[in-house]
Amino acid sequence: MKHWWWKILAVVLVLGASIAALRVPLKQALVHVSPDRIAPGPVALEVTGYNTRFGKDEQAWLENDGQKVCAASVIVVNEHLVRMTVDVPAGLRSNMTDVCVGRSRLNGALYTEGLGSGIAEEHECGIGGKYVDFSFTFPNRNILYETIRNLCFHVPMWFSMMVLFGISLVASIRALGSTDLRHDMAADLSVRVGLLFCVMGLITGSLWARATWGAWWTNDVKLNGAAVSALIYLAYLVLRGSVPEPSKRARLAAIYNIFAFVLLVLFIWILPRLNAVDSLHPGNGGNPAFGSYDLDNSLRVVFYPACLGWILIGVWMYTLRLRLARLQSQLDDANPS
């Protein structure tokens, strides 16, 4: 049983994180405001919410650089739609104005015209209406919305792949310093399992791109780097199949594998983070990484166990394949043809 604890932990973490990632609701949020520009004078706005429960006495207002402008009238069409009219004063200080309805806010929802040094008279707008307080919710972010759940599936695939390719790198280095072909076997099998996670990462990434960016594949440096890395490791398998002599194959494959890992780090971790390179991925090409804004504490509670669980699953798959390969090798040695 002492050798099974981490395998049981892997299953529990993956199942628990997967169920939580799919079942935990998103926070209530404002997701759309129409129109998206305002100028001094009366303006009618239509505000759409998600997971909201707007009540008949709902309060609404605009906020610009800390100054509030209360809505003249608020009509609650339903729990997720509010129509409000606002007499926009001249002299707002910032180009972007937030829209607030009850306890929900959409930052930078309105482009503001007619800027000045600030409004002379400011009113305090009360907060009313029915409030749904989910005890455990995921952040509700523009563009991502429900697809933010995929973070707990997509990113763990890449972490698992990196760990497995790292195991392969260590095995290849050991293979160069030894004549023991078991190191070469370990490098080969860890690459094969790592490629499985690479493919799953590409699939989940493509699905996510379709839902958020509107295309199955975009000319994104990280997407292209991941695809090139997959081809590099597929070429590793082709190289192994083209060299029949075991010891020569082990040395050539080990040298190739070391360079492959260097290129993997370059394409996935270094190039996308250069400011001169445009990338849609968070944390790349000047885009902000998942931090306190996107990856809040509730999402971390699910995200980190998911990463650890999938890494352990990947290592488990690798050890199973390695044991089977060693048993097959022993049988072949005992029964030479």
Regions found by a protein language model. Give the residues of each.
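Membrane-interface transmembrane-helix boundary segments in multi-pass integral membrane proteins
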Residues: 273-315, 333-337
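Early transmembrane hairpin module of multi-pass membrane proteins
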Residues: 133-173, 177-183
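Immunoglobulin-like IPT/TIG beta-sandwich domains and homologous Ig-like subdomains
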Residues: 33-109
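Beta-strand/beta-sandwich contexts
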Residues: 16-57, 111-134
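Hydrophobic alpha-helical membrane-insertion segments
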Residues: 13-21, 255-271
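N-terminal membrane topogenic signal
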Residues: 1-11
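Membrane-interface helix-loop-helix modules in multi-pass inner-membrane proteins
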Residues: 195-241
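Hydrophobic cores of alpha-helical transmembrane segments in multi-pass inner/ER membrane proteins
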Residues: 158-171, 228-240, 301-319
